[in-house]
Amino acid sequence: MAGQYWRAAGITYLQYANICGTHVRNCLKEPFRAAAKNREGFISNTVMYQNGKESSTIILNSELLQKELLVKKN
């Protein structure tokens, strides 16, 4: 089973699924690859509240997270 390999590699299932999805998108021909690249990005906002008021906002962007992961690997 493939589950044994991602566990043996020391990665989570979500990391494994992300790697597989990236490889599949890279195999697509150009007009379809560009459309798939546009769909894979995301932006998420997280708002922290203290005493019923907004204290801080964190914006999670897929591009920023990818850069952070590359920095952690090196």
Curated annotation (Swiss-Prot):
Pfam families associated with the record: ATP-synt_Eps
**InterPro entries, alphabetized:** ATP_synth_F1_esu_mt, ATP_synth_F1_esu_sf_mt
The Swiss-Prot or TrEMBL record annotates one GO molecular function as: proton-transporting ATP synthase activity, rotational mechanism
Q: Where in the cell is it found?
A: Mitochondrion; Mitochondrion inner membrane
Mostly located where?
mitochondrion
Biological-process GO terms, alphabetical: proton motive force-driven mitochondrial ATP synthesis
Instruction: Extract one GO cellular component term from the record.
Output: mitochondrial inner membrane
- Top-level lineage group: Eukaryota
Q: Which UniProt keywords apply?
A: ATP synthesis, CF(1), Hydrogen ion transport, Ion transport, Membrane, Mitochondrion, Mitochondrion inner membrane, Transport
Has keyword Ion transport?
yes
Record's SUPFAM superfamilies? Epsilon subunit of mitochondrial F1F0-ATP synthase (SSF48690)
Q: Kindly state the subunit structure of this protein.
A: Component of the ATP synthase complex composed at least of ATP5F1A/subunit alpha, ATP5F1B/subunit beta, ATP5MC1/subunit c (homooctomer), MT-ATP6/subunit a, MT-ATP8/subunit 8, ATP5ME/subunit e, ATP5MF/subunit f, ATP5MG/subunit g, ATP5MK/subunit k, ATP5MJ/subunit j, ATP5F1C/subunit gamma, ATP5F1D/subunit delta, ATP5F1E/subunit epsilon, ATP5PF/subunit F6, ATP5PB/subunit b, ATP5PD/subunit d, ATP5PO/subunit OSCP.
Main function: Subunit epsilon, of the mitochondrial membrane ATP synthase complex (F(1)F(0) ATP synthase or Complex V) that produces ATP from ADP in the presence of a proton gradient across the membrane which is generated by electron transport complexes of the respiratory chain. ATP synthase complex consist of a soluble F(1) head domain - the catalytic core - and a membrane F(1) domain - the membrane proton channel. These two domains are linked by a central stalk rotating inside the F(1) region and a stationary peripheral stalk.
PANTHER family per record: ATP SYNTHASE EPSILON CHAIN, MITOCHONDRIAL, ATP SYNTHASE SUBUNIT EPSILON, MITOCHONDRIAL
What is stated as this protein's family in its record? Belongs to the eukaryotic ATPase epsilon family.
Protein name per the record: ATP synthase F(1) complex subunit epsilon, mitochondrial
Protein species of origin: Dictyostelium discoideum
